[in-house]
């Protein structure tokens, strides 16, 4: 890029030195602003909503024409003396041997050699320039964005043969940074063009890049841009009152920003943020600057400091939390550009650039553990952004080399020991699973590792029936894996995937719902990791606003308005990000007619339990009689492969059991599920028994699942052979005994009263 810009400058100097005249080209009056070369705006692809046109400039260059080939033949060599003993020798004969004539002509045109000096000095008068020269640094330069390999840690090459030599699974080693960087920025495009909405201040630049675009709901605004090794830029486009407004924000290495045309200088004209290594600049017109200043009033220096003084992963997590706020407050999809959304998109793009800069400045090798953490968070950020900006497009930031490295690491991971890992080591493993997620050969081990982590989280959860912050973070990582895996697998064809959904559903109960809605209701906990709920991975389909409000109001000191705010926020998040869909299940093919009636699905190895509001013809149906008045509820056992049930179909009564004997050394209830439902609100929760510890905790006195004081809650036990029983515990026995004793006492009192009356009457 620098060589190209230098050649353009030389062309201009050559014209000036020999007094020649270049080829004529009219000044562009309609800036070309397509999303990517040759593409138009479509849903899910880059582009712009309308044909962009700008007001023609009043100053136009004088058209001149000359044969540049003839000029080169007359002056085959040119010496340019820039002073300070700096000279450049330009041999045109050698140049035309390497560069096609058409390209030389294009460079000649972009050098604007036909312009008069007066026109050159005046053509940028409408381009916005700062009033004062930027003098003081914005913050200070830090290297927190760089993933350096620690002393003593090994380095590996990433060729197909050598990648297998990797022995570590924890990412504490280095791999070649230039190779990874080439993968992440693999596309080649015209990143900058004179006709772009950058007001003709740049030369054409073709470079390796990643590209993105986001639209707003009003279809009149769009933001799009590129990420390269040297810089990244975002152009905001707004259609207002029949005119397009443009604002380009660029961030990059100070000494590697694209060369400006003419007499424009970054430091005196455009810089809004700078430290010892990076700079942020804005490019627009005076009129457009006034428009965007009133519309979004951006804090460029604050954005610059955040991006350059904090680790990229920290900034990315903050952006993820902002997405939660937009979802919970019903602002998704984003309808229009505002200060919040404008700054979000800038940070979104420049966070990707800082990840690139971390690779660029890491030297020869980059630390895998740190790199995977950043790329994992960026992947999640892109997925969340896609739910809030419609349409959203992103191309780039994939790497086959990284996938190969991650696959070897997954192979080396001692999955059976994952339950003994610290939270930090689990974080690293889950990030590795995400990077290896697109490798088909690694699928089985990825799901196995995820299931082991889920099982351990669930087991620990039953000790206190409370999810720790670290555990919610790990559930989030598994959730990200499921967003991809659900497209490739069906639950009952993979035991580990089934365990993941069963344990997630078991942690989605009334306590969990009220906890999350309570945090969202105070509007101060828009944290993705604090508010992430296993309900987003459950196979429950009974979530409604009214149900969530009902669960939330059970909390003390919870007003109806707060409960409604929290429940609405949780409902919006569930609607946007709930990964479990009915079509995911193989059994869905024979239950399509009942899709609207299904409340919950409980998959087991050979059969599937379906909780619904209607009986299912091909299964064994258990009519739940003690249910709420508004709707009926059935628990149906259906063969997972949609075959005929061995014992035939039909409706059966649910037998009642008062006492369950549990072995102290074995786990007779393992593989069974317990279902709780309320007479008024219906389905409450489900718990699946995975091991003895879970079995013991479910029946402990501290368990909130069996509420001995609530006479309106009922419990069913679902066996893996299709049998369903109702459990009536001690509270039912105590109720019956209480009623009998009460009747006996009342009878005695009535008898005594009657005897007293007879005695008085007789006497």
Swiss-Prot record:
- Map out region (Interaction with gL) in residue numbers: 219-283
User: Which GO cellular component terms, listed alphabetically, does the Swiss-Prot or TrEMBL entry include?
Assistant: host cell endosome membrane; host cell plasma membrane; membrane; viral envelope; virion membrane
Virion surface topology ranges: 23-739
Query: What is the annotated localization of this protein?
Result: Virion membrane; Host cell membrane; Host endosome membrane
Q: Does the keyword Cell inner membrane apply?
A: no
Which segments sit on the Intravirion face? 761-763
Write the protein's name: Envelope glycoprotein H
Entry membrane topology: Single-pass type I membrane protein
Leader peptide range in chain numbering: 1-22
Chief localization class? virion
Task: Say which family it is in.
Answer: Belongs to the herpesviridae glycoprotein H family.
Native organism is: Equine herpesvirus 2 (strain 86/87)
Instruction: Name its GO BP terms in alphabetical order.
Output: fusion of virus membrane with host plasma membrane; symbiont entry into host cell
Renumbered to this chain, region (Disordered) spans 29-56
